[in-house]
Amino acid sequence: MEDMMWLTDKSRIQQTNEANNWYLLDNEVFEDEDGTIYLTPRGFKTDNYTIPDWVAWIGGSKSKWDVRPSHLHDFACEYHKLIKVKMTKSSLKRYKYLTENKEGMKVCEDIPTNCLELVDVTKWEADCLFKRAMKSTKVIPSRVYNTFRCGVFFNFGWLKKPKIFDFSKIYTKEQ
């Protein structure tokens, strides 16, 4: 087992014209404990932490903590799938997909779609991944990530029919 970690730095998001909706400005990449790498693409629309207000109150606000885990979870909830990167961390660095921008932030350039795979995910898997992704930030206290993990148990949005993901629009806001 490897350490799980975010391979990209904190989120940069842009507010949409809709209340509580944001677009990711950068690709976000997470390496899970088994070495699997997941991508949440730039242009993805999110509402950050979608948890009941009472859970947020217990956990100390929805926007106080690193929001990258919520984006990964939102993607899984919207499509019932995740984007798996079919490259290793060292390959991503070697081919300059994982790099630093001029401000010194770790970023991920657009990975070609032939190096990506859409994989099915169950609600349980998505919720457990959410907790691991929160834990890996190393800034979200355990009481918060455990509370938020319990909160997503009540996410009945999963029961909606999932959207179909279109790889031809992966890095756009048209998804």
Can you say where each PLM-predicted feature lies in the sequence?
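Extended terminal accessory/targeting regions
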Residues: M1-Q175
